[in-house]
């Protein structure tokens, strides 16, 4: 039953997505059949329903307008290879690292493009030329608004009412199907020949699958299409894995991300060989599949078979469907996929995420999806690096004399309370390429007295990369000219890197300590006693002690930490 219901829903959506992508409607049906069956059989989710989706419309339409239909098939084929490789190399989990502002931004942009792109069909405008650029398509609408066909508006209005009203009164019946049937009957019998139909625009829909044909793939074509293919693959991966997560939440199952990508990849490799367009997991159809009692991938296979039977038996009737009936279906899809609440909430908070969101959205609408994704990701990475670099804190500290445990504190360091021979710095945050220079300047720029000992407290440094190690090496070599460097509390990852680079041996194994207190005791042993005479800073409790008493105190504290 689930496969039958989803198959009925998929037919009008497949044709609508194909038309909006700039290709004949039958190619959407071919995609629904072939990709739908393969994704169900080979994917990593038991309930996934695959096929053409709205997210692909702008990128596919752009490829068709710029490179032609055959190159669209090649781009889809390349995207399938990329998806398969992503699954083989277990990159499925990496998709979750794509920032939410980027995905919401381009999804909202796609929704706007789809919605505005259907206005001419909704209004029945004649003489409208399709352009790849959004702004030119808007101009076309205003230039031809006087050609509005009220019969088309009436047809589209009937379909829209059916699409919106059917779920409310008859929740088990697919709204798009009822909308198409009702509006087609009205247009056919009440005002025949007054509105453009699929048949009058694209010709009759054949009632059989196309023959196998391998596209002519050359190195030049690969270089030409690799960028849009990458975007198709990324969009397909995001959509399919998001759909699989939704299915997991509804069914209590657990999908296999990498297997899902392999299934999506194989489907997109084979589908273009039969004239199909790129496909991915469809969230709405997958949810419908589960709601109607699906228990296995068989429902997805049945959905493809149902579409095939409809193609064979009822293709001539599909040619009579008005284009005005397709428009409201796609408009509702655009409205539902826009994530408008998340979009406006993220804009309201006015953070760097808001900036990423708006820029990605605007580039999607006014430039192209490829540029939008590239710029959005680069901007997100740069702003993330900036935020992470701001988290590094390097403060000069001393033991707090008012704390019985002698914990260090930056507030007790003053011009009259600071040891000239020992400098202690508390380092907090990831020490990576974005923060390394700030770290170095914070230490070298504030140690004016050339201390004999530099103690770095690195217990709050979770990460050290090679750039951070390089700047730490600069500090070590700078201070080794007149003293030594001690490090306390270092974490496993930074320590492992220092061992690999050799800096651990340069600093010296004996100069690494688990506890700051023991490191301070060691530092006190290295002091030039003559410089301590007459010193008024009293940075440490031991400063007022005699040399023999000092040594005795050090040994006692060592025993206390080792016990």
Question: What feature does the model see in each segment?
Answer:
Residues 389-563:
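Cytosolic C-terminal regulatory domains/tails of membrane transporters and channels
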Residues 1-402:
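Transmembrane helical cores of multi-pass ion-transport proteins
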């Amino acid at each position: 039953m689930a496969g039958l219901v989803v198959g009925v829903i998929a037919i009008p959506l497949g044709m609508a997505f194909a038309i909006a992508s700039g290709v004949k409607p039958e190619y959407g049906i071919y995609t629904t059949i072939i990709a739908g069956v393969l994704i169900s059989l080979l994917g990593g989710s038991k309930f996934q329903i695959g096929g053409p989706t709205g997210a692909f419309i702008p990128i596919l339409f752009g490829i068709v307008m710029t490179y032609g239909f055959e190159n669209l098939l090649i781009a889809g084929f390349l995207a399938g290879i990329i998806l398969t490789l992503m699954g083989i190399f277990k990159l499925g989990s990496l998709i979750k690292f794509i920032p939410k502002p980027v995905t919401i931004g381009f999804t909202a942009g796609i929704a706007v493009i789809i919605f505005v792109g259907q206005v001419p069909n909704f209004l029945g405008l004649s003489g409208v030329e399709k352009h790849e650029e959004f702004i030119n398509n808007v101009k076309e609408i205003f230039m031809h608004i006087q050609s509005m066909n009220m019969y088309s508006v009436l047809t589209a209005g009937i379909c829209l009412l059916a699409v919106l009203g059917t779920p409310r009164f008859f929740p088990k019946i697919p709204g798009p199907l009822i909308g198409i049937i009702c509006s087609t009957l009205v247009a056919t019998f009440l005002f025949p020949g007054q509105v453009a139909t699929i048949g009058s625009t694209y010709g009759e829909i054949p009632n059989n699958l196309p023959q196998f044909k391998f596209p002519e793939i050359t190195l030049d074509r690969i270089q030409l299409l690799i960028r849009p293919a990458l975007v198709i693959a990324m969009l397909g991966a995001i959509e399919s894995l998001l759909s699989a997560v939704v299915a997991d939440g509804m069914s209590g199952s657990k999908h296999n991300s990498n297997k899902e990508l392999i299934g999506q990849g194989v489907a997109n490799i084979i589908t273009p060989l039969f004239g199909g367009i790129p496909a991915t997991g469809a969230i709405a159809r997958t949810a419908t599949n589960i709601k109607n009692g699906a228990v296995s991938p068989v429902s997805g296979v049945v959905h493809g078979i149902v579409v095939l039977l409809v193609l064979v038996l009822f293709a001539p009737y599909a040619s009579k469907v008005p284009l005005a009936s397709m428009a409201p279906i796609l408009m509702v899809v655009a409205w539902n996929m826009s994530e408008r609440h998340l979009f406006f909430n993220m804009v309201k908070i006015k953070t760097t995420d808001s900036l990423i969101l708006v820029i990605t959205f605007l580039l999607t609408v006014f430039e192209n999806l490829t540029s939008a994704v590239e710029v959005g990701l680069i901007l997100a990475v740069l702003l993330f690096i900036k935020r992470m670099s701001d988290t590094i804190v390097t403060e000069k500290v001393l033991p707090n004399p008012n704390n019985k445990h002698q914990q260090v504190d930056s507030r007790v360091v003053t011009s009259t309370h600071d040891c000239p021979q020992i400098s202690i710095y508390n380092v907090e945050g990831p020490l990576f390429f974005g923060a390394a220079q700030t770290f170095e300047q914070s230490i070298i720029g504030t140690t004016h007295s050339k201390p004999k000992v530099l103690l770095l407290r690195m217990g709050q440094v979770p990460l050290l990369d090679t750039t951070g190690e390089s700047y730490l090496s600069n500090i070590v070599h700078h201070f080794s000219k007149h003293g030594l460097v001690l490090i306390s509390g270092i974490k496993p990852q930074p320590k492992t890197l220092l061992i690999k680079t050799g800096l651990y041996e340069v600093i010296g194994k004996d100069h690494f300590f688990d506890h700051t207190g023991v490191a301070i005791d060691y530092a006190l042993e290295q002091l030039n006693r003559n410089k301590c005479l007459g010193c008024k800073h009293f940075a440490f409790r031991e400063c007022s002690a005699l040399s023999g008493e000092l040594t005795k105190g050090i040994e006692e504290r060592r025993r206390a930490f080792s016990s």
